[in-house]
Amino acid sequence: MRKKISIIGAGFVGSTTAHWLAAKELGDIVLLDIVEGIPQGKALDLYEASPIEDFDVRVIGTNDYADTANSDVIVVTSGAPRKPGMSREDLIKVNADITRDCISKAAPLSPNAVIIMVNNPLDAMTYLAAEVSGFPKERVMGQAGVLDAARYRTFIAMEAGVSVEDVQAMLMGGHGDEMVPLPRFSTISGIPVSHFIAPDRLAQIIERTRKGGGEIVNLLKTGSAYYAPAAATAQMVEAVLKDKKRVVPVAAYLTGQYGLHDMYFGVPVVLGAGGVEKIIELPLNEEEMALLNASAKAVRATLDTLKSL
């Protein structure tokens, strides 16, 4: 039986995720959007690349949630970007309405699926998706940490002048300014990153990582990143469908780990067929724990805003 992946939202991130997934031959792909013609056109275009790129998966575009039934993985990328003059609360409300609508329609049709959220504000939207779906918390997660860690690894490799393949890096916390990169748990082929990069330069790399999404928005002027976010999402889908037991940072539901309760928050996990199969608790020092708590406070504030709407 072939695996089935449904992607809700056929914008740049959604359609590029479909591209990465097709190239990896992870399963048949359903690309869904509310705008007629967009998912159908993008899906057909991608499907027509299959004889050239030699991937043997079916790709369909649709506006009908019935086509997503019995999915193994549901990826939600749909959401509104923040517009000029829009308050943080306005953005939360708009995207909460979108998330509620998507999940309430998709989840009942695929009761055994793993849900991966890719819309913002991520931790709050993932919490909402878990609530609306009623799924076990380990089968609902958010993608941010894999992307943030990839940016962190890229900048470390650039600075050290080494292959990015040899850079391992860990970070935690919320997405964006609230993220907590962990240099103490970052290595180049097992060698501490501090052996290659001076503390002041590493501090600059950490700051650039925190602002990574904004840097691309400022360069593009009219959009945001999509290649790397889509690749990060595809890596998570692959870990689930192939039961790879990957150790990656994702937004997972916490029940006391790191002293945090009843919230989705970026932590290292073991990711496999069951979704978040284990949450890894790192022995953080006082400084790292202070940064983590500050991040958690910001994420909690967003969650409180969501709950008050």
Curated annotation (Swiss-Prot):
Positions annotated as active site in the UniProt record: H175
GO biological-process terms attached to the record: lactate metabolic process; tricarboxylic acid cycle
UniProt signal peptide: none
Catalytic activity: (S)-malate + NAD(+) = oxaloacetate + NADH + H(+)
Pfam families: Ldh_1_C, Ldh_1_N
Residue positions binding substrate: R82, R88, N120, R151
Keywords linked to the UniProt accession: NAD, Oxidoreductase, Tricarboxylic acid cycle
KW Oxidoreductase (keyword) present: yes
Gene3D superfamilies: Lactate dehydrogenase/glycoside hydrolase, family 4, C-terminal, NAD(P)-binding Rossmann-like Domain
One GO MF term: L-lactate dehydrogenase activity
Record EC number: 1.1.1.37
Residues that bind NAD(+): G9, A10, G11, F12, V13, G14, D33, N95, V118, N119, N120
Keyword NAD recorded: yes
Task performed by this protein: Catalyzes the reversible oxidation of malate to oxaloacetate.
Family: Belongs to the LDH/MDH superfamily. MDH type 3 family.
Name this protein carries in UniProt: Malate dehydrogenase
